[in-house]
Amino acid sequence: MVLWILWRPFGFSRRLLKLERHSITESKSLIPLAWTSLTQTLSESPGIFLLGQRKRFSTMPEIETHERDSELFSPPSDVRGMTKLDRTAFKKTVNIPVLKVRKEIVSRLMRSLRRAALQRPGIKRVIEDPEDKESRLILLDPYKIFTHDSFEKAELSVLEQLNVSPQISKYNLELTYENFKSEEILRAVLPEGQDVTSGFSRVGHIAHLNLRDHQLPFKQLIGQVMIDKNPGITSAVNKINNIDNMYRNFHMEVLSGEQNMMTKVRENKYTYEFDFSKVYWNPRLSTEHSRITELLKAGDVLFDVFAGVGPFAIPVAKKNCTVFANDLNPESHKWLLHNCKLNKVDQKVKIFNLDGKDFLQGPVKEELIQLLSLSKERKPSVHIVMNLPAKAIEFLSAFKWLLDGQPCSNEFLPIVHCYSFSKDANPAKDVRQRAGAVLGISLEACSSVHLVRNVAPNKEMLCITFQIPAAVLYKNQTKNPENHEDPPLKRQRTAEAFSDEKTQIASNT
């Protein structure tokens, strides 16, 4: 039984107070007698007026405990197992705290109640009072505010200054599909205990998901939820195989939305256009693209062996570097040409459509012969990027004895940035050993390894950076007249070395 009394505290506002919650075990015949006795006692007390007994008081509720309903903003339980999205099934009414205020002070008050106000998708934090046109109701966060004592000291001070009672009332708020977050919807729909897909890679208007087997029965619903809950997304696709073909693109299925895969993305100030279904693009590599770009300075030369649509080549060309970019995929080659023109670097980038090995042993070899024969004052720094993590290490064999004649000074030897995946417990050591095995040398003392990102559990993407040793690059070595004594191999100058145990992690967006 709940007993309510109205108490007028000194000089502020009226309050409803619950005296105590009683568990009645006596005979029902005793209840009226006890009630009558308590009524007489309270009526004699000054300043206290008895209102009556209620099981629930809708406008000024009983003081609540600090126990919170963790499922308050969860969708209805009967949506569990839904495979075809029915938005109407997500309607739900919840009881939340509100604060009644005069409409003319709402703007001033809301600046001070940001912490306490309810924040839910599609829900206004201030609504009209259905019983008073001159008042407004501020919806409060039920996980933060459950009695007037839940307000912070600063908030109470503002309320008092504006002559607003901190008395909390309840309001029945109707929630719909629009008011739930994507993660809340998917958690309610998928079987309990299963992983929920709430993240994806955004490629222009396309949401690219990698669904797991247990999520496939819900794939159409998941795709539609991603479109509904992410402004600008009009198509959701799922990768249905690994990137294992010669062109580095993957087969995908459209889960929901439009079939159009022609898209435009902006990365690090540059714009790229392409058909996402026919080329490779990974938005999670934007930080890595910037990292490599920062290593080059004006006048340097870049050979991009697996250039894709240009995320390395174009930013580097913008730094007034000379770029030679290659990709075997005819679609990537087409969009690389297009994007170079789009970003106004087409005069600084020479583009090829060759196999990576043919590119290295053809155009790269020819250019290196010219570049490395220049005088010391004119020699640029030469970088070779090989971003094909599944196979790039295999292409390192193309550097063995690539050049004839007299080696250049060690400081001008080309710098290679080669990407690879590793599932080894020590991925940096693994990549060094595999790259060294292909080249026929040890790279332990003359390379650095950068951890690019975690691809999957126990699978890392890394970049090993090193200068190609003269013993590898040149077929017939003779004494270099510029160097009376060839110094031992050293770590290359432009990439930061680190220990195998403390691999630096680059965060990607």
Curated annotation (Swiss-Prot):
Keywords: Cytoplasm, Methyltransferase, Mitochondrion, Nucleus, S-adenosyl-L-methionine, Transferase, Transit peptide, tRNA processing
Principal location listed in the UniProt entry: mitochondrion
GO MF assignments: tRNA (guanine(37)-N1)-methyltransferase activity; tRNA methyltransferase activity
Domain of life: Eukaryota
Documented EC number(s): 2.1.1.228
Transmembrane regions: none
GO biological process terms, semicolon-separated: mitochondrial tRNA methylation; tRNA N1-guanine methylation
Ranges for region Disordered: 478-509
Any one GO cellular component localisation term in the record: mitochondrial matrix
A family per Pfam: TRM5-TYW2_MTfase
Presequence boundaries: 1-57
Compartments, record wording: Mitochondrion matrix; Nucleus; Cytoplasm
Entry function: Involved in mitochondrial tRNA methylation. Specifically methylates the N1 position of guanosine-37 in various tRNAs. Methylation is not dependent on the nature of the nucleoside 5' of the target nucleoside. This is the first step in the biosynthesis of wybutosine (yW), a modified base adjacent to the anticodon of tRNAs and required for accurate decoding.
Family: Belongs to the class I-like SAM-binding methyltransferase superfamily. TRM5/TYW2 family.
Entries under HAMAP family matching the protein: TRM5
Protein name: tRNA (guanine(37)-N(1))-methyltransferase
